[in-house]
Amino acid sequence: MTPKTFVATLKEHQIDVSQKQLDQFEIYFERLVATNQNVNLTAITEKEAVYLKHFFDSVAPTLYLESLRTMPLNICDIGAGAGFPSLPMKILFPQLKVTIVDSLNKRIHFLEELVAELGLTDVTLVHDRAELFSQVKRPYREQFDMVTARAVAPMNVLAEFCLPAVKVGGQFVALKASQSDTELAEAAFAIETLGGQLKEDIAFNLPETNDPRHLVIIDKVQSTPDKYPRRAGVPVKKPLMAKEEK
């Protein structure tokens, strides 16, 4: 996907990209590739692949969720790595207030420099583990209108990382590259236990490559019990499952 095609494809979805925003994406691409030589940010470095599989993929939620386009949502991106999906969404929709959480300080340093160079405001960067970020008595617990995650972890693990940070009435949006038929069913217990309720699983394909993608949207319908998230490492080693599933 060339930058020109990126702009044209978004326009088909009634999203206009200004020259300033296009320049910001170009700076993003250049800094991503340059920094990646020293810090492991991405395996994808070819320009057209970055525009498709990082930039377009990251803004996909805005094609389906009007609130991201029109409201000043307070969103949190957990395990954002090189800033995906939150920073591409922030570039297109500057009214969003973004908090990015990542456990690797080198990635946070990259994002600090990038955010400054892009001239973005209302972006907070937090160096922390997902399991610690939203524990009881931490200032970020149940504070966000929306929490996003673009990760390969199973949904029952992502739910424990992300739902505790979502305020009641907010949403958790998982961007999944692929999803087994059973993954959501296996995550149902975790989602309910953590105060969530599955709203929708939107399946779509990336343009040009037809790579499958899923947006899993979970409403936060009640407060997360105090004991979640569990201590660092436990959600991955012992994902939440109903007793009969174990």
From Swiss-Prot:
Annotated S-adenosyl-L-methionine binding lies at G79, F84, A130, E131, R150
Q: Does the keyword rRNA processing apply?
A: yes
Keyword rRNA processing applies: yes
Question: What general EC class does the enzyme of this chain belong to?
Answer: transferase
Segments passing through the bilayer: none
| Keyword terms, alphabetized | Cytoplasm, Methyltransferase, rRNA processing, S-adenosyl-L-methionine, Transferase
- The UniProt record lists the EC number as 2.1.1.-
Xref: InterPro entries: rRNA_ssu_MeTfrase_G (IPR003682), SAM-dependent_MTases_sf (IPR029063)
Gene Ontology CC annotations of this record: cytosol
Task: Report the locations given in the UniProt record.
Answer: Cytoplasm
Entry's SUPFAM superfamilies? S-adenosyl-L-methionine-dependent methyltransferases
Q: Which Gene3D superfamilies match?
A: Vaccinia Virus protein VP39
**GO MF terms, alphabetically ordered:** rRNA (guanine-N7-)-methyltransferase activity
Q: What does this protein do?
A: Specifically methylates the N7 position of a guanine in 16S rRNA.
Return the similarity comment.
Belongs to the methyltransferase superfamily. RNA methyltransferase RsmG family.
The entry's protein name is: Ribosomal RNA small subunit methyltransferase G
Q: Which organism is it from?
A: Latilactobacillus sakei subsp. sakei (strain 23K) (Lactobacillus sakei subsp. sakei)
